[in-house]
Regions:
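Intrinsically disordered, low-complexity, mixed-charge
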Residues: 1-88
Length: 88
């Protein structure tokens, strides 16, 4: 299955972005992780079908209600097997 790394930029920390990302990933059946970066962004590594990943990317472009997303940088990665989705 495809694996993508997302770097989500903007006002994305302190707005429950990671919790929302985990909820969305679980809802659509993605596996992987999400974490805050030291420079104030959020990074996610997700594995699933192309359709699942596209849905997660679409959600990430807006995020939760209080987030202000300015950019989402997406890179394709080697497939990584995960069991579930975690917040790091």
């Amino acid at each position: 299955m495809p694996t993508n790394r997302l770097l989500i930029k903007g006002k994305v920390q302190g707005v429950f972005f990671r919790a929302g990302a985990k909820e969305m990933a679980n809802k659509i059946g993605l596996t992987g992780w999400v974490k805050n970066t030291i420079d104030g962004n959020v990074e996610a590594l997700v594995t699933g079908t192309a359709l699942q990943i596209d849905e997660f990317i679409a959600w990430s472009r807006q995020g939760p209600k209080r987030a202000i997303v300015t950019n989402v940088i997406i890179t394709r990665e080697e497939e990584e097997p995960f069991s579930g989705f975690i917040i790091k």
